[in-house]
Amino acid sequence: MRIDYIDFFSRVIPEWMARSNQKSQEVGFGSDTYWLWVVTTIGEICKQYNDDSLVTEQFGLLFNWLEKQAG
């Protein structure tokens, strides 16, 4: 599978971040519902990209950043 990294970084990541912000406002950033959504959606997107290492590492960075924000 050839991956369009430009599309991934310019569309997929920003769209996911926007949905993440919306979800955190809906259910609360610290809620189990939010974190389940985070893990589920990250997993789904990574699978769409056949768990490509750059994709999974990027989402790993985002997940770690979110955890730090949560305190």
PLM feature spans:
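Short, charged early-sequence alpha-helical segments and their helix-coil boundaries
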Residues: 46-68
